Amino acid sequence: MSSPIRNIAIIGATGQMGSEISKTLLQSGFNVTAIQRSDSTKTVPSGVKSIKLDLNDVSALTTAFQGQDAVISAAPDPIVLENQKPWIDAAVAAGVKRIVPSEYSTNVDSPLAEGLPIVVDKVRARRYLIEKITENGNNSSWMSVNNGPFFELVLGFGGLGPNFRSKTAKYHNGGDNLIGTTKISDVAETIAKVLRGEGGLYKEAENKSLYIHSAAVSEKQLTKMAEKVTGQKFEVQNFDVEEVYQNAKAKFAEGDRSVWIDFYYQMMYGKGYGGSEGFQEMSWNDKVGLKTMSDKEIEDGLRKAAQQAGMI
């Protein structure tokens, strides 16, 4: 490995995202430690060390981060800024070389992103992290990974075109706009490659957000593929993204959190948000050596989702 990273602490190491990152880092030869809540009963992946503590205790976290070269947050959504501050403060205080906040979203760098409840605290957490690194003046740096909707997860609940349980398909603004979607394993491997320092990636990714995608797909494309692999037709439902967004804002203001996902459609397809508009231009795929999925691989993913839903 041609980077200074050897020891890595992970917050959220037992979740779907965190466990994949942990396993990939272990396979890459890193020493991995899971930072868990004091009362956690979840089992960490084999080979991962566990430290249980109060995640709001900056002093305890700082001690836990001593000797760690990188800290990665794989905390699940929703991200709440106040819950991020203690570990960020501790990581910077401990002089951790590379700090990776939990983003894993679409275009968090868009000036409009902070207006969306679904990512506002991710935007603010990154800003807070940068401020702390600047204030401290040590050698800490940050990076983040943004990957669009997770391929396996979004197919499971019908968030990107076909819904295998209801046999419906949602098209937003016509359903033809491409968006980047990424396999969890590709996110994990990208992080590992950067921290290994392959091809100078460790330095190149310093203080940057890395945008990647396993596939560039549209809702209409996925629906047609779903019809092919299932042999069944999906009832198409058309939605105007701006109308969905305004409706979500009104309901969210009344305390309805069920509209949470509707804000993500604005992030993906809304004008000026840089989701479908700019993800390919921002892509780090070539730099990190990430090959996009073939049609067959996408169809295999759709087939698996259909089987899990009991459609085939």
How would you describe each model-predicted region?
Residues 49-70:
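Conserved Rossmann-fold cofactor-binding substructure of NAD(P)-dependent oxidoreductases
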Residues 9, 51, 100:
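Conserved Rossmann-like nucleotide-binding pocket used by diverse enzymes
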Residues 205, 243-312:
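A hydrophobic C-terminal alpha-helical subdomain
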Residues 55, 76, 104:
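Short glycine-/small-residue-rich Rossmann-like dinucleotide-binding loops
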Residues 66-101, 121-131:
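NAD(P)-cofactor binding segment of oxidoreductase domains
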Residues 2-45, 56-59, 81, 94, ...:
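Oxidoreductase cofactor-interface core, primarily capturing Rossmann-like NAD(P)-dependent enzymes
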Residues 1-3, 311-312:
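Universal eukaryotic N-terminal targeting presequences
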